[in-house]
């Protein structure tokens, strides 16, 4: 596939047929205990977070969801997390640090939501706080880029000891 153009690779990264975060999470992890909300404002369904088991070991798993149908895309804001989503992820990361659980993230986002409401609710600060927190964690962090990884919105969930990019991501 060395003759694939950059534009074709972008199309491949955005393909609806690509496995999403939940496909990987449901295939790899057991005993999921889903965590919702940022404890400040509201739940962002775009960012999924759970405590789970990977080969019997407890881990924290975080992923961005885009959806496949129009209804799902609307529900998940087309894969663009809000400040609440980043704060939920931070809450889970702090909890993972406290209980010494490794963190695994699955990133597929065109970037953070850019709406006026998101900016008013502290989108830039939420992204910066995620970057700072992830870079200071003592637990192992594996970040897997499974599709798009646009701008700081993706970086906020992709700082890790190991960063894995899937082909055409």
Which residue ranges define each predicted feature?
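Terminal-region recognition feature
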Residues: 1-155, 159-164, 168-169
């Amino acid at each position: 596939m060395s003759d694939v153009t950059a534009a074709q690779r972008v199309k491949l990264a955005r393909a609806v047929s690509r496995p999403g975060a939940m496909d990987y999470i449901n295939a790899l992890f057991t005993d999921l205990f889903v965590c919702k909300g940022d404890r400040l404002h509201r739940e962002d369904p775009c960012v999924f977070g759970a405590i789970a088991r990977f080969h019997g070991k407890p881990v924290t798993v975080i992923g961005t969801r885009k959806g496949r149908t129009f209804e799902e895309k609307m529900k998940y804001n087309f894969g663009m997390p809000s400040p609440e989503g980043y704060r939920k992820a931070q809450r889970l990361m702090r909890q993972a640090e406290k209980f010494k659980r490794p963190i695994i993230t699955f990133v597929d986002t065109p970037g953070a939501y850019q709406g006026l409401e998101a900016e008013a609710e502290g989108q830039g600060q939420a992204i910066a706080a995620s970057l700072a927190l992830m870079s200071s964690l003592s637990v192992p962090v594996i970040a897997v880029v499974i599709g798009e990884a646009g701008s700081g919105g993706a970086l906020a969930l992709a700082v890790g000891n190991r960063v894995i990019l899937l082909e055409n991501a």
